[in-house]
Amino acid sequence: MTDKTSIILSVRNISVAFGAKQVLNKLCLDIHAKEILGFIGPSGSGKSVLMRTILGLAHKQSGEITIFGHDIDKVSAEKRQEIDGAMGVLFQHGALFSALTVLENIQLPMRQYLQLPLKLMNELALLKIELVGLPRDAAAKYPSELSGGMIKRAALARALALDPQLLFLDEPTSGLDPIGAAEFDELIVSLRDTMGLSVYMVTHDLDSLHAICDRIAVLGEGRIKVQGTLDEMHQCEDVWVAAYFKGKRARQILPRETPQLKERLS
């Protein structure tokens, strides 16, 4: 499933500190085209900080970030906007604007990056709503009128508004029941397959790691300690990794795998 001939995101020697606390220390990481990379680590290890740094939402002390072949520190403002428009982000709690409808939330990236008539934006937003499995009448609802699962899907629709190449997911299944989480996993795989997405997924969800990730990267002590396939994670002798994947809470099977997802992954 992973196209290793094409690296679309390369992080080299990234360091980030907040005051005296060194969060990331010369960290290196690659993401390949059309892969789903699961990103894990202890709480407070800097997983979300790295994602925010890649997105330009947090300042780095040093290092190089190359996205779609471009060093983001050396591109023009116009090129950076083009790169930003080719990335979609689903934040942990959705981050929908409460005063806007689902339709209006999805249109926000379109308004920022595109010059489109309102009618066309309405049509495109409705297509994204259907793409993530929401009913069309969800378009007129406000976030307060949605369930947790619907909020996740609406936020995902917004992340997909500009047909990105690279999708960032921050704890996408947190707060969902097992059935809803399994359906969300299935949706991510379907979107990767149909849209050719590359997915960077911060998660603590063992079921998601087992079910949909091509590779897993483990952050600890400010760097990538281990990265590889699920099988390689199970063979890893690192104490934290072994406890995570083989401890009492670890799942040895795919209990949340739906028939549709099983068929797609086979």
Which residue ranges define each predicted feature?
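The feature captures the beta-strand-to-loop junction immediately N-terminal to the Walker
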Residues: 40-42
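Helix-to-loop junction immediately C-terminal to a conserved catalytic motif
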Residues: 55
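Conserved ABC ATPase "signature" region
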Residues: 71, 118-137
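Conserved ABC ATPase signature
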Residues: 142-146, 150
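A short, proline-enriched helix->beta-strand linker immediately N-terminal to the Walker B motif
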Residues: 161-165
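Catalytic Walker B motif of ABC-type/P-loop ATPase nucleotide-binding domains
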Residues: 167-170
